[in-house]
Amino acid sequence: MTSDFYSRANGMRDKLLGARKEGLDSMEYEDALGSVLWELYDLIGRPVIKRFDVLHVPEQSRVWWCPTSVLCSLPLHAMGPIRSDGRVGLYFSDLYIPSYTPTLSALIEARKPGTQIFEEPSTLLVAQPDAEIPGALQEMLVVQANSPSVTTLVGNKATPTAVMEHLRDHRFVHISCHGELEIGKPFDASFKLHRGSRLTLLDIVRSQLPDAEFAFLAACHTAELTEESIADEGLHLTGAVQYCGFRSVVGTMWAMADIDGPDLAGSFYRTVFADRWEGVPYYERTAEALRDAVRSLRRKRNMRLERWVNFVHYGA
């Protein structure tokens, strides 16, 4: 990065962190986020898309971002709005299907050919509703209604021991609870389960899950990087779960609006399990399914930027 590039990237990060102190639902944050999305497009998106044109990369291609340093904290997947071929009001995710990866080696591992399983995966659903995430129960019902086979661990059944036992038998997992990242110790990051018990990423790594394919982390702040965590080069909870062996992971950049969880989950799983994907492994459907679900969310009346920019995909 040139000094000017680095200075502008730092300025965008500082603008978002400063506005966030006013609250994610404040007009200050909404204005700051809109300004940052446009500047990201001007700084990164415009030259990248021009290069895609030179290389004849077609629209709707998969694109993986592997950011470092301060760029790890910025929403590259949602740059815009973009004017393209007379079309206005488009964002990067309208033109391409964006994903992230914490490192190139993690992406190579996630996309490594293996035994392709085309039968419908069973989903482990882990939910820990409380006063801060009351929508977890409705989200749970939506996941159950739109997935072919679901095992549910909720409330007092959601213990670390129970989750680890069931993870071995499921290729998909949907976790709707609080997540916490330990700065400088990514594998001490954890999900808060029954009575404050914690399932750490180190527990998952040690369990060795050869069939793990996809994790949906509907927990708070699973992909968020703060000023203090920038030095960790983007290894936050979402990226760390990919390191645990899951080929694809969906997370959030900040606290999710409670009303968005059920709608987005329903749209997402309906797309993943639709009939149109002949010959495509289920975990490889998740990036496009998330992109389409977010676009549907974006079309809602009075939809704020921070609500739809929030969702990110990592991995294959």
Predicted regions and their residues:
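Beta-sheet entry/capping signal
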Residues: 60-64, 122-123, 150-151, 171-173, ...
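Structural motif
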Residues: 66-70, 127-131, 155-157, 177-178
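Short helix-loop-beta junction
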Residues: 138-151, 240-247
